[in-house]
Amino acid sequence: MICVVIMRHQAWQSDGLPLSSSSNEACKLYDAILSQYVTWRNDETLGGIEGCITSIKAADPDFVMGHVISTGLELVGTGSSVLRDERLASAVRRTVELADTQQLTSREKNHVKAVQLFSKGALHKACEVWECILADHPTDLLALKFAHDGFFYLGEQTQMRDSVARVMPHWKPHMPLYRQIKGMYSFGLLETRLYDEAEKMAKEALSLTPEDGWSVHAVAHVHEMKAEVEKGLNFMASTEKNWTVCDMLACHNYWHWALYHIEKGNYEAALKIFDEQVSQRCVKSGAMLDIVDSCSLLYRLELEGVSVGERYRELLQVTQPHSEDHTLLFNDLHFLMVSLGSKDTGTTQRLLESLQELAKDPAENRQLQIAERVGLPMCQALLEFEQRNYRQAVELLKPIKQSFVEIGGSDAQRDVFSQLLIHAAMKSGDKEHQQLARCMLMERDAVRPNSPLTDRLIQRAHSLHA
């Protein structure tokens, strides 16, 4: 059972974060939703996040921050798009309309503004607004977590780290969820390659809260990025009972566990985790993080020459409804892996054509603004690789390989695209491409020494190019 610290209306006011609602119940539920979001853990005694959202609307239907957190969470989840989901678009409009008719604090008004900007795809502008909130209210945890997620989607790794660093001195050990701030900062540290500092910070958090799934996740990343396979396997196994209680993150942590097995060449073990954990959790939750993890795991295995059977077709049932959402290019690329793996040319065509059409008039949408330069070439490269046009795949990816970060996600998640370029370059008949593959493998070996996967790829390159 999760320990949710329930704060009443007066407590929020005492902390300098007043909530414009006359309902103590609504304020308590707001706190419960925020706590579950930050801890990645649904509290079933409260009905989970969904149950709390239903209850908060009943307690105070006009509570603006209740609408901000419920609508904001759906937007940040990236599983729905206002372009295709009128219910979500209506929820955003309702939030703005309520704010226009009430006397709110400037902090609350800025929260509404940020949610509206995020709904338009203006993630960078939304993050600027959340940062403005944090400048005056450094303990506003909703602004901090939304900004953290926003910077993650933008690939703004330094900002993701520094956004937390700027507010940490204002957080004290007695404050609710203080421990989770350490985990957030740890993730920012590791995404800026400060691995030792990241591991130290995450383990400090875990010494206080062993079931902190996000800090477990940070340590898993450190071992992945340093190719510390045995350490990673032992760590995940020894802490499994702790982090599986974080139901919104457990699937992703199993994904990390499977990556160690792929790194080691234990493909059957990786498939076992996919079948018993990742796939089942993905279907059950429908959460976008779980979906892209499933896509990525199958694709990585195929790059290694592993047959995944009918798994792509089964996963297509989950990804297909999202093929024209276009909330994030990162998501689109993963959906494309599945439609290509399933040989579903219709879904592939719809995804590419609809993205091309939206990219013609991106407006404020940051993802669509970079689609033509980064996203669409990456999509086309996946298609060319699937059709064994390796030379074309390399020509598409090589000029933008330093721009992969702009699609968002973590270094570990985006590594699949670096692997794709290496495989395409190795298989290309072009001598310059083959040289590129060898150079990328040397780069990889320098920053991740003792990587079994890199060693295998180097051996493969030598045998192909001998």
From Swiss-Prot:
It comes from the Eukaryota. TPR repeats lie at residues 175-212, 251-284, 368-400. Keywords: Repeat, TPR repeat. Signal peptide: none annotated. PANTHER family: TETRATRICOPEPTIDE REPEAT PROTEIN 38 (PTHR16263:SF4). Belongs to the TTC38 family. This is Tetratricopeptide repeat protein 38. It comes from Danio rerio.
